[in-house]
Protein backbone atom coordinates (compact mmCIF):
# COMPACT_ATOMS: atom_id res chain seq x y z
CA UNK A 1 0.00 0.00 0.00
CA UNK A 2 1.34 3.43 -0.98
CA UNK A 3 1.92 6.01 1.70
CA UNK A 4 0.20 9.37 1.67
CA UNK A 5 3.47 11.06 0.66
CA UNK A 6 3.95 8.62 -2.22
CA UNK A 7 0.39 9.32 -3.37
CA UNK A 8 0.99 13.07 -3.30
CA UNK A 9 4.27 12.66 -5.20
CA UNK A 10 2.50 10.52 -7.83
CA UNK A 11 -0.25 13.13 -8.19
CA UNK A 12 2.32 15.92 -8.51
CA UNK A 13 4.20 13.94 -11.17
CA UNK A 14 0.95 13.36 -13.08
CA UNK A 15 0.07 17.06 -12.95
CA UNK A 16 3.50 18.05 -14.22
CA UNK A 17 3.08 15.76 -17.25
CA UNK A 18 -0.46 16.86 -18.21
CA UNK A 19 -0.62 18.90 -21.39
CA UNK A 20 -3.50 21.12 -22.47
CA UNK A 21 -4.90 21.65 -18.97
CA UNK A 22 -4.23 24.85 -17.07
CA UNK A 23 -3.63 24.37 -13.37
CA UNK A 24 -3.50 27.12 -10.76
CA UNK A 25 -3.14 27.23 -7.00
CA UNK A 26 -4.83 29.59 -4.55
CA UNK A 27 -3.39 30.74 -1.25
CA UNK A 28 -4.58 32.76 1.72
CA UNK A 29 -2.33 35.50 3.06
CA UNK A 30 -0.72 34.23 6.28
CA UNK A 31 -1.91 35.62 9.59
CA UNK A 32 0.87 34.20 11.75
CA UNK A 33 4.58 33.49 11.42
CA UNK A 34 3.91 29.73 11.40
CA UNK A 35 1.32 30.13 8.65
CA UNK A 36 3.82 32.18 6.65
CA UNK A 37 6.43 29.41 6.85
CA UNK A 38 3.82 26.89 5.73
CA UNK A 39 2.76 29.14 2.85
CA UNK A 40 6.30 29.45 1.47
CA UNK A 41 6.97 25.73 1.84
CA UNK A 42 3.79 25.13 -0.16
CA UNK A 43 4.75 27.64 -2.84
CA UNK A 44 8.21 26.05 -3.15
CA UNK A 45 6.73 22.57 -3.43
CA UNK A 46 4.06 23.53 -5.97
CA UNK A 47 6.11 25.88 -8.18
CA UNK A 48 7.91 23.04 -10.05
CA UNK A 49 4.50 21.90 -11.32
CA UNK A 50 4.49 25.09 -13.43
CA UNK A 51 0.94 26.28 -12.77
CA UNK A 52 -0.50 28.93 -15.09
CA UNK A 53 -0.66 31.23 -12.08
CA UNK A 54 -0.98 31.33 -8.31
CA UNK A 55 -3.71 33.44 -6.77
CA UNK A 56 -3.89 35.04 -3.35
CA UNK A 57 -7.15 35.90 -1.62
CA UNK A 58 -7.80 39.46 -0.61
CA UNK A 59 -9.60 40.63 2.49
CA UNK A 60 -11.43 43.86 3.04
CA UNK A 61 -9.26 45.06 5.92
CA UNK A 62 -6.08 46.93 5.11
CA UNK A 63 -3.76 44.55 6.99
CA UNK A 64 -4.85 41.63 4.86
CA UNK A 65 -4.63 43.78 1.72
CA UNK A 66 -0.99 44.50 2.53
CA UNK A 67 -0.24 40.83 3.21
CA UNK A 68 -1.89 39.85 -0.08
CA UNK A 69 0.21 42.41 -1.93
CA UNK A 70 3.43 41.22 -0.27
CA UNK A 71 2.67 37.56 -1.07
CA UNK A 72 1.80 38.32 -4.70
CA UNK A 73 5.02 40.28 -5.23
CA UNK A 74 7.16 37.62 -3.55
CA UNK A 75 5.63 34.72 -5.50
CA UNK A 76 6.41 36.48 -8.77
CA UNK A 77 9.89 37.54 -7.68
CA UNK A 78 10.96 34.16 -6.32
CA UNK A 79 9.25 31.75 -8.72
CA UNK A 80 8.68 33.70 -11.94
CA UNK A 81 5.10 32.39 -11.91
CA UNK A 82 2.30 34.87 -12.48
CA UNK A 83 0.68 35.78 -9.18
CA UNK A 84 -2.86 37.12 -9.19
CA UNK A 85 -4.49 38.96 -6.30
CA UNK A 86 -8.17 38.78 -5.57
CA UNK A 87 -9.57 42.29 -5.26
CA UNK A 88 -12.46 43.06 -2.95
CA UNK A 89 -14.29 46.33 -3.41
CA UNK A 90 -15.79 46.26 0.09
CA UNK A 91 -14.63 49.04 2.40
CA UNK A 92 -12.58 50.84 -0.27
CA UNK A 93 -13.23 53.98 -2.26
CA UNK A 94 -12.94 54.12 -6.02
CA UNK A 95 -9.72 56.10 -5.65
CA UNK A 96 -8.23 53.53 -3.26
CA UNK A 97 -9.06 50.71 -5.68
CA UNK A 98 -7.46 52.61 -8.56
CA UNK A 99 -4.28 53.09 -6.49
CA UNK A 100 -4.23 49.42 -5.45
CA UNK A 101 -4.66 48.32 -9.07
CA UNK A 102 -1.93 50.73 -10.25
CA UNK A 103 0.45 49.34 -7.65
CA UNK A 104 -0.16 45.78 -8.87
CA UNK A 105 0.31 46.80 -12.51
CA UNK A 106 3.58 48.55 -11.66
CA UNK A 107 4.75 45.44 -9.80
CA UNK A 108 4.22 43.35 -12.92
Where are these regions (language model features)?
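N-terminal amphipathic alpha-helix/helix-capping segment at the start of soluble metabolic enzymes
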Residues: 1-25, 32, 76
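An N-terminal assembly and electron-transfer interface module characteristic of large anaerobic redox
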Residues: 2-4, 66, 105
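Acidic, glycine-rich active-site loops and adjacent beta-strand->loop/helix elements
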Residues: 60, 89-94
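Alpha-helix-loop-beta-strand connector modules within alpha/beta enzyme cores
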Residues: 17, 62-85
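Alpha/beta enzyme core
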Residues: 17-22, 31-54, 77-78, 94-108
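Glycine-rich, proline-tolerant flexible connector loops at the mouths of alpha/beta enzymes
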Residues: 30-31, 50-71
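Hydrophobic faces of well-ordered beta-strands that scaffold small-molecule active sites
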Residues: 21-29, 54-56, 83-87
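Short secondary-structure capping/turn segments at boundaries of alpha-helices and beta-strands
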Residues: 11, 42-43, 72
Amino acid sequence: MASYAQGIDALNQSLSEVKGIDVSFEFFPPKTELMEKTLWKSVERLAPLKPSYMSVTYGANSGERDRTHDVVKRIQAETGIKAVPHLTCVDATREELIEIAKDYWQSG
